[in-house]
Design a protein with these regions (language model features):
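A beta-strand edge to alpha-helix "cap/lid" segment located at domain peripheries
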Residues: 1-30, 35-125
Length: 125
């Protein structure tokens, strides 16, 4: 894994989380490919518009911390894998999440854009 590629993908992902922290829905949307598929831990899948509207209506992110991240590059595609711990308000109630995730990023017009994300809840131990 190239340190440069990992840094680029982590920076793009940092911008995504910062947009959610700032409730900057335009910035959040801009970091996604128009073909985004976001498959939730519940198996429900959102497209880009559905996901942004869902986050805007239901969630207020308070913190997010990635762990154990790996990034593999395949030309203009990068696959990111790791874990993330998040604190948020979901439908007005505090919620903690610890997920393992897989994310697919595509480089388009010189920018890395998220095109697929799938979190899986990590069981409590």
């Amino acid at each position: 894994m190239s340190k440069s590629l990992k840094s680029e993908i982590e920076a793009a992902d940092d911008r995504r989380y910062q947009a959610m922290l700032d409730c900057d829905w335009g910035a959040l949307s801009a970091g996604f490919g128009d073909d985004l598929l976001y498959t939730h831990g519940s198996a429900l899948t959102d497209n880009k518009h559905q996901y942004v509207e869902n986050v805007k209506a239901k969630y207020r992110l308070k913190s997010a911390k990635r762990e154990d991240v790996t990034v593999r590059g395949y030309g203009d595609i990068a696959i990111m894998h790791g874990r993330v711990r998040m604190e948020m308000d979901a439908d007005g109630k505090p919620r903690s999440m610890h997920n393992c995730f897989a994310a697919v990023w595509a480089k388009r017009d010189g920018q890395w854009r998220l095109i697929h994300f799938q979190p899986t809840p990590v069981p409590a131990t």
